[in-house]
């Protein structure tokens, strides 16, 4: 029996009809405010799990498990699964769904009802994030997980294609921006797969992609991450402005910004979209004028 067949034998996957029936019985309709789009193709979810290269020692974190489509695929593959769900009804329904469809591994699931953007602790230390992320919180959710949970060594996330391109973009490309640079503080992202809009219910208006991010050590030991991120935010608050003007508020004045830009070995006429993470680190470390 194949790995997929074995998993399906012990954890019955959710198809489109199953998810619609669960939604009907729970009185749930997909909520745009939570960016809810449920995957109805188990094959896509198995691919996501393979991209994560899970082991029996992993403690997985899933954000927005919904009715449990991905949860059912992950449970047989990991030691423990921490599922963070903001929707109160879905958080209450999920454990029973897992008990009925995956009884052999139901005790591996821990459901946390809450907002991932406000999470400070979890019942265990996650080693990997695997999730079909709600479209409206994908970028801040990934950054939050890397910031708060240093034990996470890798993530595999499904996000809309535009977000995936922003996360993986290089300097000078149209998709390059604050998310691209901030993510590089934690690791390197790459697109590992494409996903059709047809595998979701309700069907979104955009295509999706799967992104893998592997954590790397901080680029420069001892550098204040918050200080670097503050410069990045200032540079991209007005994306098309030259650094001298874009950083004037951050530095205190346009003249002060120019002096710090020059001290960092950059040009006042440069724009943030052309700078690397190393450039922003030098800017943050450049001494302020007296």
UniProtKB/Swiss-Prot annotation:
Chief location of this protein within or outside the cell? cytoplasm
Q: Which Pfam families match?
A: RrnaAD (PF00398)
Q: Which domain of life is it from?
A: Bacteria
Cell compartments where the protein resides: Cytoplasm
Reactions it catalyzes: adenosine(1518)/adenosine(1519) in 16S rRNA + 4 S-adenosyl-L-methionine = N(6)-dimethyladenosine(1518)/N(6)-dimethyladenosine(1519) in 16S rRNA + 4 S-adenosyl-L-homocysteine + 4 H(+)
Which GO terms of the molecular function aspect are on file? 16S rRNA (adenine(1518)-N(6)/adenine(1519)-N(6))-dimethyltransferase activity; RNA binding
Q: Name one GO cellular component term.
A: cytosol
| E.C. designation(s) | 2.1.1.182
Q: What class of enzyme is it?
A: transferase
Where on this chain does S-adenosyl-L-methionine bind?
A: 37, 39, 64, 85, 115, 132
Q: Which SUPFAM superfamilies match?
A: S-adenosyl-L-methionine-dependent methyltransferases
Enumerate the PROSITE patterns for this protein.
RRNA_A_DIMETH, SAM_RNA_A_N6_MT
Keyword vocabulary terms for this entry: Cytoplasm, Methyltransferase, RNA-binding, rRNA processing, S-adenosyl-L-methionine, Transferase
**Which InterPro entries does the record associate with it?**
KsgA/Erm, rRNA_Ade_diMease-like_C, rRNA_Ade_Mease_Trfase_CS, rRNA_Ade_methylase_Trfase_N, rRNA_adenine_dimethylase, SAM-dependent_MTases_sf
Give the family, as the similarity comment puts it: Belongs to the class I-like SAM-binding methyltransferase superfamily. rRNA adenine N(6)-methyltransferase family. RsmA subfamily.
Q: What does this protein do?
A: Specifically dimethylates two adjacent adenosines (A1518 and A1519) in the loop of a conserved hairpin near the 3'-end of 16S rRNA in the 30S particle. May play a critical role in biogenesis of 30S subunits.
Q: What is this protein called?
A: Ribosomal RNA small subunit methyltransferase A
Record organism: Acidothermus cellulolyticus (strain ATCC 43068 / DSM 8971 / 11B)
Question: Where is the organism placed in the taxonomic lineage, from the top?
Answer: Bacteria, Bacillati, Actinomycetota, Actinomycetes, Acidothermales
């Amino acid at each position: 029996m194949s790995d997929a067949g074995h998993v399906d034998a012990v954890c019955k996957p959710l198809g489109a009809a199953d998810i619609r029936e669960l939604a009907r019985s729970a009185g749930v309709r997909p909520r745009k405010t939570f960016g809810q789009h449920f995957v109805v193709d188990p094959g896509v979810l198995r691919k996501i799990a393979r991209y994560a290269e899970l082991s029996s020692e992993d403690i997985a974190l899933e954000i927005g498990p919904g009715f449990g489509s991905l949860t059912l695929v992950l449970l047989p593959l990991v030691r423990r699964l921490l599922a963070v769900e903001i929707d109160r009804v879905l958080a209450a329904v999920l454990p029973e769904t897992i008990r009925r469809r995956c009884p052999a591994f139901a005790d591996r699931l821990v459901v946390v009802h809450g907002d991932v953007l406000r999470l400070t602790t979890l019942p265990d230390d996650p080693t990997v994030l695997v999730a079909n992320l709600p479209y409206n919180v994908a970028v801040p959710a990934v950054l939050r997980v890397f910031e708060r949970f240093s034990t996470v060594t890798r993530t595999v996330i499904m996000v809309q294609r535009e977000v995936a391109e922003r996360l993986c973009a290089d300097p000078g490309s149209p998709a390059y921006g604050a998310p691209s640079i901030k993510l590089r503080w934690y690791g390197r992202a790459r697109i590992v797969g494409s996903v059709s809009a047809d595998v979701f219910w309700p069907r979104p208006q955009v295509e999706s992609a799967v992104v893998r991010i592997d954590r790397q050590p901080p680029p420069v030991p001892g550098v204040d991450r918050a200080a670097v991120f503050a410069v990045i935010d200032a540079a991209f608050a007005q994306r098309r402005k030259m650094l001298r003007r874009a950083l004037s508020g951050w530095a205190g004045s346009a003249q002060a910004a120019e002096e710090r830009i020059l001290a960092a070995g950059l040009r006042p006429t440069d724009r943030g979209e052309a700078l690397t993470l190393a450039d922003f680190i030098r800017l943050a470390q450049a001494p302020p004028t007296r």
